[in-house]
């Protein structure tokens, strides 16, 4: 481990002790060496005893910097793992850091472009439009067409810093998991691995560009979502150049009302967009927090969303989509047995799970939700309740569904912020029913046959040979089975003969012994004993020699 890694480790440890996070471990869970380690840093005391544990964790992550801030933000969406107070505190973490030097930004941009900024852009603004932990954004005008663009560039050395912190996190998570044991609900190693995959994906701006292009193409003819144009020839791993957009932040409700935006239509379109991305395209924006969503300034009576930052996208398998659709439909039909069966059929809970107990646990959690009108029931909280219940029965974690549940909570919160009377069920029900109809109807059967047709067309010429080989193998197996049966019968015959002779010999020996002890004629006794000995010898020789069939 390098000196810098040791120094960073000390910084993290000092911060954890400063906020008293070591006290979160129950005394019976603390390692034996814990008091000794704590004593070595006796001068670092908990300076925030007046604050709750959740608030202290939030402050510690804020102090530790961008990588930990992003981890906290991700944890705030894992409500299947955290209680509401912890999730609420971590959700308040802000990924805002001072901008880095514009000279470094220029150097990084020119390195990626292999050209000077002045040769490609006019009016490059050294003052960034936004600055975050991974990248910052500058505005400019393209020389080639005169259009306004923004350039998103990664921070210098950000990859090395993130990888170093991730390595330290992994070591800490492994240690914490050993301390807490397998039954712990938080599962630190799993959380850190999920976070590692997410944040490393955000470091590849070329991937973000390709995601944005795909999402834009999916909604080219849509009047509900607009994705800015990506200049693919100017986008690389550490730089992305895109069309500059002008809109109203979705969180700026007063500005939306001031321009007369149709908030009811906007809220309904948000839900429709989510289900369209999931069920039609199987490609959904999974980072739809307010900072990434804007609303058009033109046509406020027919508003549309503007989506930015496609670094985190989600996809689902057909099994996932069926699980999602059938679970929602079963929930609103109060069919808790079907919900339990779906988890079993998907292979996410063990086949040895007590299905009756699982069904009852789901019912206990879900039934109280029907005390409120259908329009007020949250899809995200339904999924959350199912995840939490299933985890009690050792459900295998499905990262793609956790990502979807997080996005669904964002969409619902956004929709009800825009229009509190939004009826999520009535808006989403047609999408779910249409998708299910496509999965089980005649057209679905024909589509599956059509998709498998190339495979069968390729295998068809091999069919006669496969049939011949199987018949040949069958005959060979039949012959082998007959040989084994003959051997078995022969073995049984010899075994029966041997047993018969040995038992008979035992009878003669017993009779001879009785005659001898009763002082009966000596010759009769010797005859019985001799006959018994002879029969025993014949029986022993008649034993099957080969016990292996």
Swiss-Prot record:
The keyword RNA-binding does not apply. Pathway: Cofactor biosynthesis; ubiquinone biosynthesis [regulation]. One of its GO terms (molecular function) is ATP binding. Pfam families: ABC1 (PF03109). Its main location: membrane. Keywords: ATP-binding, Cell inner membrane, Cell membrane, Kinase, Membrane, Nucleotide-binding, Transferase, Transmembrane, Transmembrane helix, Ubiquinone biosynthesis. Residues 123-501 form the Protein kinase domain. Its EC number is 2.7.-.-. It is a multi-pass membrane protein. ATP binds at residues 129-137, 152. InterPro entries: ABC1_dom (IPR004147), Kinase-like_dom_sf (IPR011009), UbiB (IPR010232), UbiB_bact (IPR045308), UbiB_kinase (IPR050154). The active site is at 287 (proton acceptor). The chain crosses the membrane at residues 498-517, 521-540. NCBIfam families: PRK04750.1, UbiB. PANTHER family: CHAPERONE-ACTIVITY OF BC1 COMPLEX CABC1 -RELATED, PROTEIN ACTIVITY OF BC1 COMPLEX KINASE 7, CHLOROPLASTIC. This is Probable protein kinase UbiB.
């Amino acid at each position: 481990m390098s000196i810098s890694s040791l120094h960073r480790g000390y910084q993290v440890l000092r911060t954890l002790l400063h906020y008293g996070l070591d006290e979160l471990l129950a005394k019976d869970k603390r390692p034996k060496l814990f008091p000794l380690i704590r004593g070595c840093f006796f001068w670092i005391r908990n300076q925030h005893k007046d604050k709750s544990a959740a608030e202290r964790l939030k402050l510690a992550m804020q102090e530790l910097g961008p990588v930990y801030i992003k981890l906290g933000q991700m944890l705030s969406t894992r409500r299947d793992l955290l209680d509401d107070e912890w999730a609420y505190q971590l959700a308040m973490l802000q990924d805002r850091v001072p901008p880095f030097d514009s000279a470094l930004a220029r150097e990084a941009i020119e390195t990626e472009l292999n050209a000077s900024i002045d040769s490609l852009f006019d009016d490059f603004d050294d003052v960034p439009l936004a600055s975050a932990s991974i990248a910052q954004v500058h505005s400019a005008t393209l020389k080639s067409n005169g259009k306004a663009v923004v350039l998103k560039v990664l921070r210098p050395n950000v990859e090395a810093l993130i990888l170093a912190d991730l390595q330290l996190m992994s070591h800490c998570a492994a240690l914490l998991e050993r301390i807490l044991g397998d039954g712990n609900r938080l599962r630190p190693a799993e959380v850190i691995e999920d976070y590692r995959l997410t944040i490393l994906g955000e470091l590849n701006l070329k991937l973000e560009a390709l995601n944005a292009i795909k999402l834009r193409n999916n909604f080219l003819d849509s009047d509900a979502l607009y994705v800015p144009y990506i200049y693919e020839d100017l986008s690389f791993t550490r730089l992305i150049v895109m069309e500059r957009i002008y809109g109203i932040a979705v969180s700026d409700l007063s500005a939306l009302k001031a321009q007369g935006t149709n908030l009811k239509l906007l809220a309904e379109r948000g839900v429709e967009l989510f289900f369209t991305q999931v069920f039609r395209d199987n490609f959904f924006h999974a980072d739809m927090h307010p900072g990434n969503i804007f609303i058009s300034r033109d046509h406020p009576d027919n508003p549309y969303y503007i989506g930015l930052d496609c670094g985190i996208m989600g996809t689902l398998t057909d099994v996932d989509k069926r699980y999602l659709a059938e679970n929602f439909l079963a929930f609103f039909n109060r069919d808790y047995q079907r919900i339990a069966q779906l988890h079993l059929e998907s292979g996410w809970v063990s086949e040895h799970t007590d299905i009756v107990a699982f069904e009852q646990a789901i019912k206990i959690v879900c039934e109280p939700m029907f005390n409120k009108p259908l329009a007020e029931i949250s899809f995200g909280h339904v999924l959350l309740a199912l995840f939490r219940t299933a985890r009690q029965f050792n459900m295998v974690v499905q990262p793609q569904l956790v990502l979807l549940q997080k996005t669904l909570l964002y969409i619902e919160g956004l929709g009800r912020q825009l229009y509190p009377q939004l009826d999520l069920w009535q808006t989403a029900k047609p999408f779910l029913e249409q998708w299910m109809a496509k999965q089980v109807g005649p057209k679905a059967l024909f589509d599956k046959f059509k998709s498998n047709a190339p495979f069968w067309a390729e295998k068809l010429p091999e069919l006669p040979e496969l049939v011949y080989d199987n018949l040949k193998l069958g005959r060979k197996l039949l012959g082998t089975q007959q040989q084994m049966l003959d051997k078995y019968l022969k073995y049984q015959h010899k075994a029966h003969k041997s047993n018969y002779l040995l038992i008979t010999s035992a009878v003669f020996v017993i009779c001879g012994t009785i005659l001898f002890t009763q002082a009966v004629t000596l010759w009769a006794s010797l005859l019985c004993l001799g006959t018994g000995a002879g029969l025993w010898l014949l029986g022993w020789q008649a034993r099957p020699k080969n016990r292996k069939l």
